[in-house]
Design a protein with these regions (language model features):
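Long, domain-scale non-catalytic interaction/scaffolding regions in large secretory-pathway
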Residues: 2, 6, 11-27, 31, ...
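Extended, solvent-exposed functional surface patches
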Residues: 9-201, 207-211, 351-390
Length: 517
């Protein structure tokens, strides 16, 4: 046996090693064996966006130090608010998790942009995205036509996710994508079930959303709409017309060509500060009542801009914001926009690339403009200190005797214990816990042990992921690893993030583990 000691260099991605064995007595007798390995840092791929509106000038700030491989650092600007959608599409495309809503959100707005603003989707293979999502949706569709949040055997369908998926399928069929007839039929059957139930409150828009999807799919839904209106009037007379449910009903009546009913409900929505709901209303207004949305002008976009500029968006809200911006899109001349003397590319908006060393990059224009600074890639450096913003995470390694260790021997089997705790008053679900493995570890298949509040989990080649509910109590899950390499290795932090609370996130500190023979 021959041992080789290797040092990881900064270049990321696939690296090829070539091993050559040659006869000492006869140099013509030799054998060569290539071996490819993937080199990644101790930090996960991340995304950061700055979006906003300026009247004359914007100066780029907060440039991230990212590895050059797989790095995207671009600044775009335009007089059209559709430029904001270019950033949201990048965010959705690289989002690392895949519940049903997130899968649909990855492709639904991209599909709509492809058919209304095709230049914006020029670098996206929307059809390949569609095919990938359809495979997973088939796995998750239940007998009653709904869709489960995760691919977990025996799970029940989620009402909102199911109606949202049905909406996507109806629009995909409209655009001549290959939607299996039986799949769509079952999804619409589930929508009939949802449209026929009573709302659980004025904010429960799922029945109205389901009625809208059915109408969009060619069903006559007058009875559903009349029953919903009767229920709303009896229980929420003062508030229901200001809800998103009323906006969905207005759009449904418009599709049914009942102009009086449609106009009677449209335009009364009261912005709630919830970007997903506010954006859905803008999308419906711009699609079915363009004259009313045009009268609101810039105020319509302002409803979307505030949460986008503060980074307070998720996949759901980003998808509906993209749909809304796409529906509002209009042609704008961007010839007055300049970038500190740099020549922009038009993709389709004026765009320049920058690097971590970039300083004093400024966008200027004689007219007001919207801008997006997109930064995606692997951050240089380790997370040497822990962070806890609404959430705490930590991890430790244990040997077969249950003793906590920071060293190991080649061939050992260790138990990894990941602990998490919510720091908010109320519990919150849909928390992604991502534990990346040191280069010396190999996760043992089927070793993950979880409790009741883990909705789904997955052991991958280089990480373990669990989707959990967090509260004030400490919870844990464990899994086993096998030590497969000798040397000194960085222990990546464990990361936690609430998928629908963008400002709730945490990481443990990175560390080191020494492996001996």
């Amino acid at each position: 046996m021959v041992k080789f000691r290797l040092k990881a260099l900064p270049k990321l991605g696939a690296q090829e090693l070539m091993f050559t064995a040659e006869s000492v007595r006869d140099s013509s007798r030799k054998a060569r064996m290539p071996y490819t390995m993937s080199l990644r840092p101790s930090t996960p791929y991340g995304s950061k966006f700055a979006m906003g509106y300026e009247t004359s000038q914007y100066r780029l700030q907060g440039v991230e130090d990212l590895y050059p491989e797989f790095r995207v650092q671009q600044l775009s600007a335009s007089g059209s608010p559709l430029v904001l959608a270019s950033g949201l599409l990048k965010y959705l495309d690289k989002f690392p998790h895949g519940c049903t809503e997130q899968l649909v959100s990855k492709v639904f707005p991209a599909m709509e942009v492809l058919f209304k603003s095709p230049a914006l989707a020029a670098n996206m293979d929307v059809y390949a995205l569609f095919d990938d999502v359809m495979v997973k949706l088939r796995e998750r569709q239940t007998l009653d036509g709904g869709f489960t949040t995760w691919s977990v055997p025996g799970a029940k369908p989620d009402a909102y996710d199911s109606v949202y998926a049905a909406h996507f399928l109806v629009k995909a069929r409209e655009h001549d994508f290959n939607v299996p007839e039986n799949m769509l039929k079952k999804a619409l059957s589930y929508c009939e079930e949802q449209a026929g139930r009573s709302p659980e409150g004025p904010e429960d828009m799922v029945p109205a959303y389901a009625a809208y999807v059915l109408t969009l799919g060619g069903k006559v839904t007058t009875n559903y709409l009349l029953n919903l209106e009767e229920y709303y009037k009896a229980n929420y007379e003062k508030s229901w017309r200001k809800s998103l449910g009323a906006s969905f009903m207005a759009a449904s009546y418009k599709l049914l060509q009942d102009e009086n009913k449609a106009r009677g409900l449209a335009g009364q929505y009261l912005p709630s500060g919830n970007l997903a709901a506010d954006a859905a209303n803008v999308y419906l207004m711009a699609t079915y009542f363009p004259d009313m949305s045009e009268n609101l002008g810039k105020k319509t976009v302002e409803v979307l801009l505030k949460p986008l500029s503060s980074g307070d968006f998720t996949t759901d809200s980003a998808a509906f914001a993209t749909l809304a911006l796409n529906a509002l899109s209009r042609e704008e001349s961007d010839k007055d926009i300049s970038f500190s003397g740099m020549k922009p590319a038009y993709t389709p908006f004026p765009t320049v690339d920058f690097v971590p060393q970039t300083k004093n990059l400024t966008v200027s224009s004689k007219r007001p403009f919207y801008y997006v600074a997109a930064q995606q890639g692997f951050a240089v450096g380790d997370k040497k200190t822990a962070a806890a913003e609404g959430l705490e995470v930590s991890k430790a390694f244990y040997d077969r005797d249950g003793k906590q260790v920071s060293t190991a021997k080649l061939g050992d089997e260790l138990t990894v214990k990941v602990i998490y705790r919510g720091l908010r008053k109320e519990s919150f679900g849909d928390v992604a816990i991502v534990d990346m493995l040191p280069g010396c570890f190999e996760a043992v298949s089927n070793s993950l042990q979880t409790d009741w509040n883990v909705a789904a989990s997955d052991i991958r080649e280089d990480r373990v992921v669990a989707y959990v509910t967090a509260d004030r109590e400490a919870h844990e899950f464990t899994y086993k690893v096998r030590v497969i390499a000798e040397g000194d290795f960085i222990v990546p932090p464990v990361y936690g993030s609430a998928l629908y609370l963008p400002l709730v996130r945490a990481n443990s500190a990175s560390g080191m583990i020494k492996v001996s023979e």
